[in-house]
Amino acid sequence: DCCHNTQLPFIYKTCPEGCNL
């Protein structure tokens, strides 16, 4: 998922609006 940080799954990366998993 583009919103999940691969190192810390509970932390969200910056990604385009609409990707808010």
From Swiss-Prot:
Annotated GO MF terms: toxin activity
UniProt PTM: Contains 4 disulfide bonds.
Recorded superkingdom: Eukaryota
Expression sites (tissue/organ): Expressed by the venom gland.
Family per record: Belongs to the three-finger toxin family. Short-chain subfamily. Orphan group XV sub-subfamily.
Further details from the record: Is classified as a P-type cytotoxin, since homologs have a proline residue at position 31.
Chain's role: Has hemolytic activity under low-lecithin conditions. Has low cytotoxic activity. Inhibits the expression of VEGF and bFGF in human non-small-cell lung cancer cell line NCI-H1299 in a dose-dependent manner.
Protein name, entry field: Cardiotoxin-like basic polypeptide ah
Organism: Naja atra (Chinese cobra)
